Amino acid sequence: MANNFLEVNNVDFKAGGKTKVKNVSFSVQNEGDIICLLGPSGIGKTTILRTIAGLEKINNGSIIINNKTISSKKIHIEPEDRNISLAFQDNSLFPHYNVEKNILIGTEKKNKKKIKINAKEIVEFLNLKKILNKYPHEISAGEAQRSSLARALVSNPDLLLLDEPLSNVDQSFKEEIQVELKQLLSKSKITTIIVTHDSYEAFYLGSKCGII
């Protein structure tokens, strides 16, 4: 266990007096692995991602990355200090910013030269160049999903968390984006955890899958 890239150990999380996650444990063995967590809606998959990202403080257990505890009952490293990116299910693009500014949000304190290089490569790979000056209401659901992925990847995080990344994409675009996403994750070699209720998606995208 000590050599695992990520360890989630017996994690409990409560909110509003209710238990949202209880005694959850899993691990990611190697950097670059793509892990899919498969389970029905409402079971706590998103909450697990939020605890890993540091958006929620756990009540019991621990979360460890590269042998460093980032969450426990007594320890809570803030989200901005974790180098973890979380792409939400609803894209969460800011409506008053264009696509380019949405992609670069949160990179202000990063190395500008590296961010510029990363952004250029990701934008080209995801075919976003033509919509950089457009606003979220002017683009398709598929383009919005690609923009959200670009934002999550541009800072080159240690860990990428994807919450139902294709759930809001029209079925006619879904297969195309699945292929693009798999290629992008393989190319980036960023350790990734994807939560989904779609078994085909889980086994297509993931190098390993777990059922919650």
Please describe what each predicted stretch is.
Residues 154-158:
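A short, proline-enriched helix->beta-strand linker immediately N-terminal to the Walker B motif
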Residues 97-106:
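Short coil-to-helix segment of the ABC ATPase nucleotide-binding domain corresponding to the Q-loop/switch region
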Residues 160-164:
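Catalytic Walker B motif of ABC-type/P-loop ATPase nucleotide-binding domains
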